[in-house]
Curated annotation (Swiss-Prot):
Residues 15-359 form the Kinesin motor domain. It comes from Oryza sativa subsp. japonica (Rice). Disulfide bonds: none annotated. This is Kinesin-like protein KIN-10B. InterPro entries: Kinesin-like_fam, Kinesin_motor_dom, Kinesin_motor_dom_sf, P-loop_NTPase, RuvA_2-like.
Length: 726
């Protein structure tokens, strides 16, 4: 109870508070076929509500016996049905506590004669169990409801300022019909909006209230009228609908004009009915559930600070549009009423309310902010670095998978290969991806030979040779260590023809077509460089194996000019690696070397030239002569105009042009030139010059002569005739 008293009161926050209320009254006896599967309980946290599953009903037990019961997953979901809201009122809490924490701040801060600003509005919506809502709004003989307590406070505050209190009551059926409950009429109530966005219900009556007794009678009358309304459909329950109560507080000025001070909406939302239940077949559930979903969407949009609020989805939300909003002069609260023993319908209602609560939307908002920050930090990385690292790692992993196969590392298989098989493996040794130009190839080859070839051996070409071969290569590794510098020089002179054999042949074939290329795309060039760098590392490992073998077997030396490519390949396959015991380089060193090669290639100017003959071929001239055709003559036959009309039109144009020239002359002539006109003397000329100093374009129409300098129509005609006949 102490935790419950420390809850944050409603109103003033700008959003919509969503609270739960467990009905304190004894529930009516349920029907025999009712399935009360849950018991509502509040956990240690006052804003966390749990639905504890009860023992299964007879139908559920029968289904479980027949093998159709809920599985472990369904049982786990039932045990985890916990929902968080902005506040919860237990069974022992009276209605006075709910009114003091949730409704009273709305009345005190939103007008109602208590110092609020004019035109302020508030909204109180209740949904859930019907008995719990009735006890919350109407109360019981022991404790009053929210209607009575709110009206009592409004009457006391309005008497102090001389304001009047009026009430209206309506019912919404099937989300299409709005009926007046205080004064039933044949026509329905219409929803209208003014230019300021205020909602008005046309045709809804207002009844003045001066005491609590009158208000109690009006509430009873509205309740009876609701029960006796004819159903719009045979499948529609008579009490199925949303009932609303509006309390207006207004005053009148000296002229008798009404000034709205406050408007408070109370809405009893129809209960949510699960359409999956068989007992609910035949009811018009679509419209009732639609209104609840529309209202929850509005509440969620307000609590999650969305720009668009879907008020147009339902008539209920349109009625509450001016009060169920986020502004300084409005406040709202949504109360989910629950019975202590409930069914799946109450669980669905509270699930919708929890989704729309402020605390849940604040958690989602904080999670979205953290996700945005993490995405921004990832976007700050350079794109080239991301692409390069992904490509390099992918190539490295693919090469490691290929080299991990036992068939390629078995010495027996290598020794038994035929020359044809060796020739098949030759493209893997010496072939690289074709680059855009010979400059790129030469730069990569030089940089490849300048690097120590033994350093990249273990990373890309791991071997699992036999123990005998490892012992045999110990002597070879010693020889290679002593003659390291000589080996590097020999590689640059003799092995380069072998490795670059296919590259040069490909470049010769591409020499003719290279002139016609207009340019290389930078992204494709980057990918080719990474691929070439990986192939070069493979070639370098095989080259240093070749030289290690040449030091051990002079008769198989690569310096022999009579040696064929097939014999060289056989020696390379049968050889044993000389650097299997050396440590592999770090991945960061390899990445640094590749980045340096990319920087060197980026300085190469891109060829954007194109030959003239390419342009001429692209722009082929059509030399086929067109078929001769007889020229078409379009004759326009017009009726002859009346000479009088032509003369009138031309004379009108002459008059207009003459008047325009006269006005231009009056706006630019000096004193002597003005005096040369008929009707303008010394006095008028001086007056015109004085006025022209204030506005350069003094005369814009002929009528300005009459208005400014006082010339009559006769003088104006004489002046114009004097211009024509000087």
């Amino acid at each position: 109870m102490e935790q419950q008293q420390k809850q944050e009161p409603g109103g003033g926050g700008g959003g919509v508070r969503v609270v739960a209320r467990i009905c304190p009254c004894a529930p009516p006896p349920p029907p025999p076929d009712a399935a009360l599967n849950f018991q509502v309980a509040a956990l240690n946290d006052p804003a966390l509500i749990s639905f504890i599953p009860r023992r299964p009903t007879a139908s559920a037990a029968t289904a479980a016996a027949s093998g159709r019961g809920d599985g472990p997953k369904d049982k786990q979901q039932q045990q985890q049905q916990k929902y968080r809201v902005d506040g919860c009122y237990l069974r022992d809490d009276p209605n006075h506590r709910v009114f003091h924490n949730e409704v009273k701040p709305l009345i005190d801060g939103r007008g109602g004669g208590g110092g609020g600003r004019g035109g302020a509005k508030a909204c109180v919506v209740a949904c859930g169990d019907a008995a719990a809502k009735r006890h919350l709004f109407m109360g019981s003989p022991d404790q009053p409801g929210l209607f009575t307590m709110a009206m009592a406070q409004l009457l006391d505050s309005s008497k102090a300022i001389g304001a009047a209190v009026t009430v209206s009551s309506y019912q919404v059926l099937q989300d299409t019909h709005i009926l007046d409950l205080l004064e039933p009429k044949n026509h329905e109530v219409l929803i209208l909006e003014d230019a300021d966005g205020q909602t008005h219900l046309k045709g809804l009556s207002r009844v003045g209230v001066n005491s609590i007794e009158e208000f109690s009678q009006l509430c009873c009358c509205a309740t009876n009228q609701q029960r006796h309304h004819p159903a719009k459909d045979s499948t529609q329950l008579q009490d199925w609908g949303h009932q609303g109560l509006i309390i207006y507080v207004s005053s009148f000025d000296q002229q008798g004009k009404e000034c709205a001070l406050a408007k408070i909406n109370f809405l009893n939302l129809a209960g949510y009915v699960d359409p999956k239940q068989k007992k609910n077949e035949g009811l018009a559930l679509l419209t009732g559930n639609k209104s609840m979903h529309a209202l929850m969407n509005v509440v969620q949009a307000l609590n999650s600070n969305q720009r668009f609020v879907p008020y147009r989805q339902s008539k209920v939300t349109r009625i509450l549009q001016d009060s169920l909003c986020k502004s300084k002069t409005s406040g709202s609260v949504l109360i989910a009423c629950l019975a202590e023993d409930c069914c799946q319908d109450s669980v669905s209602t509270l699930a919708l309310a929890s989704r729309s609560s402020q605390v849940v939307n604040e958690q989602y908002y904080s999670l979205s902010l953290s996700a945005k920050k993490s995405s921004k930090s990832n976007m700050n990385l350079p794109t080239d670095a991301k692409t390069l690292s992904r490509t390099f790692i992918h190539k490295t992993m693919s090469m490691q998978e290929k080299n991990a196969r036992p068939g390629f590392n078995n010495s027996g298989v290598k020794g038994g290969q035929t020359p044809t098989a060796n020739r098949r493996t030759q493209p893997i040794i010496s072939s690289t991806k074709k680059s855009g130009s010979s400059i790129c190839t030469s730069i990569k080859m030089k940089e490849n030979y300048a690097k120590p070839k033994i350093s990249g051996r273990k990373l890309f070409c791991p071997s699992n040779n036999s123990l005998k071969e490892e012992n045999a290569t110990d002597v070879a590794s010693t020889v290679v260590t002593e003659t390291k510098s000589a080996t590097v020089r020999i590689q640059a002179d003799e092995v380069q023809p072998l490795v670059g054999m296919e590259i040069r042949a490909a470049l010769l074939n591409e020499g003719c077509s290279e002139i016609g290329n207009t340019g290389d795309v930078k992204s494709s060039e980057m990918q080719e460089v990474v691929h070439c760098s990986t192939q070069e590392l493979l070639a370098s490992t095989i080259q240093e194996e070749d030289y290690a073998l040449s030091n051990m077997e002079p008769e198989n030396s690569c310096t022999d000019m009579g040696l064929t490519c097939s014999s060289i390949t056989d020696n390379l396959v049968e050889k044993t690696p000389a650097s299997s015991t050396l440590s592999s380089p770090k991945l960061s060193d390899r990445l640094r070397e590749i980045s340096n090669s990319l920087k060197l290639l980026s300085t190469r100017p891109v060829s954007v030239r194109a030959e003239k003959w390419d342009i001429e071929c692209a722009r082929r001239i059509n030399t086929i002569a067109p078929e001769p055709k007889t020229p078409e003559v379009h004759l326009k036959f017009e009726q002859a105009e009346d000479p009088k009309d032509k003369l009138t039109a031309r004379s009108t144009g002459i008059k207009k042009s003459l008047a325009q020239e006269c006005l231009t002359f009056l706006n630019s002539a000096n004193k002597e030139q003005l005096k040369s006109l008929k009707g303008i003397g010394d006095k008028r000329a001086n007056y015109i010059l004085e006025l022209r100093e204030e506005s350069p374009e003094l005369f814009k129409e002929i009528s300005d002569l009459r208005d400014i300098i006082g010339m009559n129509s006769k003088e104006i005609k004489k002046m114009m005739s004097g211009i024509i006949d000087p």
